[in-house]
Amino acid sequence: MDTPRGIGTFVVWDYVVFAGMLVISAAIGIYYAFAGGGQQTSKDFLMGGRRMTAVPVALSLTASFMSAVTVLGTPSEVYRFGAIFSIFAFTYFFVVVISAEVFLPVFYKLGITSTYEYLELRFNKCVRLCGTVLFIVQTILYTGIVIYAPALALNQVTGFDLWGAVVATGVVCTFYCTLGGLKAVIWTDVFQVGIMVAGFASVIIQAVVMQGGISTILNDAYDGGRLNFWNFNPNPLQRHTFWTIIIGGTFTWTSIYGVNQSQVQRYISCKSRFQAKLSLYINLVGLWAILTCSVFCGLALYSRYHDCDPWTAKKVSAPDQLMPYLVLDILQDYPGLPGLFVACAYSGTLSTVSSSINALAAVTVEDLIKPYFRSLSERSLSWISQGMSVVYGALCIGMAALASLMGALLQAALSVFGMVGGPLMGLFALGILVPFANSIGALVGLMAGFAISLWVGIGAQIYPPLPERTLPLHLDIQGCNSTYNETNLMTTTEMPFTTSVFQIYNVQRTPLMDNWYSLSYLYFSTVGTLVTLLVGILVSLSTGGRKQNLDPRYILTKEDFLSNFDIFKKKKHVLSYKSHPVEDGGTDNPAFNHIELNSDQSGKSNGTRL
């Protein structure tokens, strides 16, 4: 087994590989700007014409889910806290099933572009506006951080130019989003998934070779207590246990996969409901693959540095720099491969940022422009959508610049992103699962859930949980020697959810701090969702419930839930009060029923009457 040595630096070939990834991403945008007649309507631009198929959408969902925060953060998480993080494999399964069987059927049969349009259909315009504004604010904030945080971590270890990377990422994303719309975003994501897999593979293969085999890595991990898969402690104050990951993780990530515009917009762009559901289940395989790669990289990190921790030895200044440090350590003799891993990390960033920009443009056009300017033509809306992509791209780059001045507030912003998702998911669940819920209950429930989530989340940042709650594992520096001594790094970044933003020391710990504020961060969304649901139900009941007849399209019906089990020989899409059977529920995307009905070539019913 090789011993750690002085780390290398970026060379010309590394920059060439990284630049190549950006150029190919931009080229895909140019292609889809003109392919098939270009972006003639807002539906073409925002939804890919609603004719996408399962496999590219599945890969896009995977890429959008796995940002650079995952590529850099998950291995360091495993390095510090152990492989219990791999329990998220079960969480992903539950998330995909809930999203595919509860939320997707309702969104798909309505043929909507913005998920927040559902809130007006189900409740009223005020509820829709609240949901839209919350989404826009959290997404701009989070996207700016996704651009800045990995650039900072990579800059500090590799010397990769910080602002060059930030601006290049933002400009390239804005470029191909503006030109090619959702089709460009999805197919660029497909390319970037390949880059992510190649980057992980290069690190894993070389780590296995240098450490003397997979068995050596696993033995080192076992000896260091990193194979801690099964911690069934039910205490909700423990940061990561089987239950916090399964329960809290399911709520947290369902708020993204189930109701977040960035993800929903992709799978409802599929040409049939079957394809939409299939994209989610294929995506599950991708999630498992990326999780396996990132967890194994974390174990390889520990095997490599089990007796000389670079973080404790001040070789790096924060945990999120450990993966770039490992890459320059083990791949320095292979010009271009460090650049491939940086391209891997930035592929995660590009996919997340492009998804966010496209989603922001969609909700702005659908929720804030179309309802008030109904005379605009589809061509005009397409141009406006492209213009909004440019505006939001610039805002996200500006947010990245602001993030550089925020210092430790980066973690607070990431936490707020999670805290907003829970109440929003509770709001959608209230509408889809509770037929008697009314608009008053929805508004009051959303405000209550949001307030409670902010309370516990901000409190946890000001008064962080004690180490016995987070359970960090032992790190050793006894094996460090004088030949393994690089210049200390001075600038710091912080690992999400592991340290305090405000660093309040020497305060008298109160029961509120040791209990409520010490709640596992994975339960923030859980609390927000459940409070929103409970308050929404109680307020709806106390105000007389919903007084108007409820269109069955707005809730999950028995036919929706059981449609995949062939219980009904004739499936129905209830798109009006006069429902009638069709050959295959979901064969035609309902957003294009007017096209089907006006076509003399279509001989079958489309499941709707206009």
Swiss-Prot record:
It catalyses: (S)-lactate(out) + 2 Na(+)(out) = (S)-lactate(in) + 2 Na(+)(in); propanoate(out) + 2 Na(+)(out) = propanoate(in) + 2 Na(+)(in); pyruvate(out) + 2 Na(+)(out) = pyruvate(in) + 2 Na(+)(in); acetate(out) + 2 Na(+)(out) = acetate(in) + 2 Na(+)(in). PROSITE patterns: NA_SOLUT_SYMP_3. Expressed in normal thyroid, localized at the apical pole of thyroid cells facing the colloid lumen, but expression profoundly decreased in thyroid carcinomas. Expressed in normal colon but absent in colon aberrant crypt foci and colon cancers. Present in normal kidney cortex, brain, prostate, gastric mucosa and breast tissue but was significantly down-regulated in primary gliomas, gastric cancer, prostate tumors and breast tumors. A motif (PDZ-binding) lies at residues 608-610. Keywords: Apoptosis, Cell membrane, Glycoprotein, Ion transport, Membrane, Sodium, Sodium transport, Symport, Transmembrane, Transmembrane helix, Transport, Tumor suppressor. Its main location: membrane. Residues 585-610 are annotated as: Disordered. The keyword Cell cycle does not apply. InterPro entries: Na/Glc_symporter_sf (IPR038377), Na/solute_symporter (IPR001734), SLC5sbd_SMCT1 (IPR041992), Sodium:Solute_Symporter_SSF (IPR051163). It comes from the Eukaryota. Residues 31-51, 105-132, 183-189, 261-279, 360-389, 437-439, 540-610 are cytoplasmic. NCBIfam families: sss. PANTHER family: SODIUM-COUPLED MONOCARBOXYLATE TRANSPORTER (PTHR42985), SODIUM-COUPLED MONOCARBOXYLATE TRANSPORTER 1 (PTHR42985:SF10). This is Sodium-coupled monocarboxylate transporter 1.
